[in-house]
Design a protein with these regions (language model features):
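Fungal secretory targeting signals
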Residues: 1-22
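Intrinsically disordered, low-complexity segments that are common in secreted/host-exposed effector
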Residues: 2-4, 54, 168
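Extracellular low-complexity, O-glycosylation-prone Ser/Thr/Pro/Gly-rich "stalks"
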Residues: 19-43, 82-173
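Short, surface-exposed binding/anchoring microloops in extracellular/periplasmic proteins
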Residues: 25-75
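Predominantly extracellular/secreted and cell-surface proteins with exposed
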Residues: 64-87, 94
Length: 173
C-alpha cells in the first residue's frame, strides 16, 4: 500500500511547497500603461513626486522600518500590496519571486522617480518617465547600500530581488 501511495505523497509534498510561487510573474522591465494592451491610469506627476519623497522620508525616520518586506506565505500567489497612496496615485508592490523579499524604501522611491536630485535622464528611465499613464517595474536595488549586508540578507532569509512596483490609480478616487 505504501508503494502505491508514494507518487501521491511526492505530489502532495511538491504541492505544499508551491504556495510561494507566483504562477503569473511579471517582468522586471519597465512597462508603461500607455503601451498597447495597457490601461492609462490618469495619475499626476506631482503625486508621483510626493510618494517618492514620502517613502524616502518614512524609511529615514527613527523607529520606522528601513525595509519594505514581503514575507511568505503572506505575499504568495502574486498578491499585490499597497505601499502608500497620495490622492489619485496608489503605489503597489507585487512579489513575483519564490523567496521572501525586502528592499529599502529608498530603492522603492528611486524606482519611482530616479533618485533624489535625479537628472532628466534618470527620471525618464524610472516610473516617473511613464508620466500620467503610470506603470510598473522591478525595484532597482542599490546593491552597494550597506543595509543589504545585514544578517537577514547574508544568511538568505530575504532577497532584495522579486518585488515589482506599480503606479496605478487609486480606486477610491
Amino acid at each position: 500500500m505504501l508503494s502505491t501511495m508514494k507518487p501521491l505523497l511526492v505530489a502532495l509534498g511538491l504541492a505544499s511547497q508551491a504556495y510561494a510561487i507566483c504562477y503569473a510573474p511579471e517582468p522586471a522591465r519597465r512597462i508603461c500603461y500607455d503601451e498597447p494592451g495597457a490601461t492609462p491610469q490618469n495619475i499626476t506627476l506631482q503625486e508621483i513626486t510626493y510618494v517618492a519623497g514620502y517613502l524616502r522620508y518614512y524609511g529615514s525616520q527613527p523607529g520606522n522600518p528601513q525595509f519594505y518586506t514581503m514575507n511568505l506565505p503572506d505575499a504568495d500567489n502574486c498578491g499585490e500590496w499597497q505601499v502608500t497612496t497620495k490622492g489619485s496615485t496608489w503605489v503597489m508592490a507585487k512579489l513575483v519571486g519564490d523567496e521572501a523579499a525586502s528592499v529599502t524604501f529608498d530603492d522603492i522611491a528611486n524606482t519611482i522617480d530616479g533618485g533624489a536630485g535625479a537628472t532628466p535622464e534618470q527620471k525618464a528611465a524610472a516610473l516617473y518617465g511613464c508620466g500620467t499613464a503610470g506603470g510598473q517595474m522591478g525595484v532597482v536595488v542599490n546593491a552597494e547600500d550597506p543595509r543589504y549586508q545585514q544578517p537577514q540578507f547574508v544568511n538568505g532569509t530575504y532577497t532584495n530581488q522579486g518585488i515589482i512596483i506599480k503606479l496605478v490609480r487609486n480606486p477610491g478616487v
